Amino acid sequence: MTYLLALDQGTSSSRSIVFDERGRIVAQAQRELPQIYPRPGWVEHDPREIWRTQLATAQDALREARITAQDVRALGITNQRETTVLWNRRTGQPVHHAIVWQDRRAEPACAQLREQGHAAAIQAKTGLLIDAYFSGTKLQWLLDHVPGARDAAEAGELAFGTVDSWLIWQLTGGTRHVTDVSNASRTMLFNVHTNQWDDELLQLLRIPRALMPEVLPSASDFGATDAALLGGPIAIGGVAGDQQSALFGQACFTAGMAKNTYGTGCFMLMHTGSRFQKSENGLLTTSAAQASRSPEYAMEGSVFVGGAVVQWLRDGLRAISASSEVQALAESVPDSGGVMMVPAFTGLGAPYWKPDARGTITGLTRGTTIAHIARAALESIAYQSAALLAAMSRDAVAAGGAPVSELRVDGGACVNDLLMQFQADLLGIPVVRPAVVETTALGAAYLAGLASGVYASTDELSALWQAERRFTPTLPRSQAEALMARWEHAVAQAVLPG
């Protein structure tokens, strides 16, 4: 039996999963990762804890699977994107906590870039909107605020990386400073047309090129693990940011294929093939995971509050005592009774981009019960995702393609049958849940398998992908369109005047 090991480093935990060559889970392990909140709007991790927890889960997973390093053909890494680590090349020690993707401290630098008129040029080169979310201004902040960091960086003494780079550095004993195109494309420093760091963007943000890792395709030779760590060397063959890895794990390899990950928020990606396409509908363009040196792209949109609305029902309203209870409560009524919820607790993300929007519940009557509100909360996840898919389809059609014909789903909330059926009804296309829902880790394993010869091509991976359940639309299109019109009216009400 051939095995592949996937390291899945996330915002709240580090996980490792052992897969067999058919993509089936053999064993898995998880360790919590504490977050650090030094000030309002600031979010950090200790990079040493990222490494400690990730290594421990890899060791645990191999032990649980009752295999050794010699049984593992290759290792793949997938990771929280944009989170920024800066470390000393000689000692291997971080010079500061990692600045997490959620952190907003670089917003003043972003505002300055926008005011100086750089938005169009940055989007043209990177596919991204100027935002503190991305790594570039986080790195700029570290160089400007950590004593001695800028001088050390210019002297070539420091290394920058997203979480994948940091893990590879540690896994290889400091011999490899590399990343992949999907992670590089989230820095706001990477030219997605040339697949290279962009000198003009580096100069604009005053970042020395000596800091930057080598960029490789997502299925490549990233080095091998130090033999002392896992009981023997293991080739590192696959690396991809979490959302691009999930797209790959869902076998979305061709233009027009799309997936939605239902987590705390929702992340929807649509593959656009070898075509870089600028969105006219509020979406980002990003590099997809690349199995070869040929550039591949995707359009991406994110919903800020997805499964988090269920947590709010539990912790805020105390309508349920456990998240798993929401489906039964929502199913206790035939519909939402006219109640519409817009969970804009932190504004609205794509395709609206309304940071000043606030959460609303409309359509309340004396007959409204907590079950109606729970159903409206659950349905709000589907409404937001439907608006996102409509924006993607408009972009696809504008570029001469076809609208998305099927949505593949993963993430914690995809197990909710009521939500998935309502999603299919709103979209008017099938929603497909895979047999293996750990698609983020599976994508990393698939990439490692391609690099190490376990798989000959992505065609082989497409044949391995299996659906667990297919939700087909049951609602007439006229009804679905009327519901979406009510949703858009509710969104307009959620935007504060002035």
From Swiss-Prot:
Residues at which ATP binds: 11-13, 264, 307, 311, 412
Residues at which ADP binds: 11, 15, 264, 307, 412, 416
GO cellular component: cytosol
Residues at which sn-glycerol 3-phosphate binds: 11, 81-82, 133, 242
Any one GO biological process: glycerol-3-phosphate metabolic process
Annotated positions binding glycerol: 81-82, 133, 242-243
Domain of life: Bacteria
Protein's pathway: Polyol metabolism; glycerol degradation via glycerol kinase pathway; sn-glycerol 3-phosphate from glycerol: step 1/1
Disulphide linkage map: none
Enzyme Commission no: 2.7.1.30
Regulation affecting activity: Inhibited by fructose 1,6-bisphosphate (FBP).
MF terms in GO: ATP binding; glycerol kinase activity
Catalysed reactions, semicolon-separated: glycerol + ATP = sn-glycerol 3-phosphate + ADP + H(+)
Coiled coil: none
Alphabetic keyword roster: ATP-binding, Glycerol metabolism, Kinase, Nucleotide-binding, Transferase
Catalytic EC class: transferase
CDD domains: FGGY_EcGK_like
Family: Belongs to the FGGY kinase family.
HAMAP family: Glycerol_kin (MF_00186)
Function text: Key enzyme in the regulation of glycerol uptake and metabolism. Catalyzes the phosphorylation of glycerol to yield sn-glycerol 3-phosphate.
Official protein name in the record: Glycerol kinase
Record organism: Acidovorax ebreus (strain TPSY)
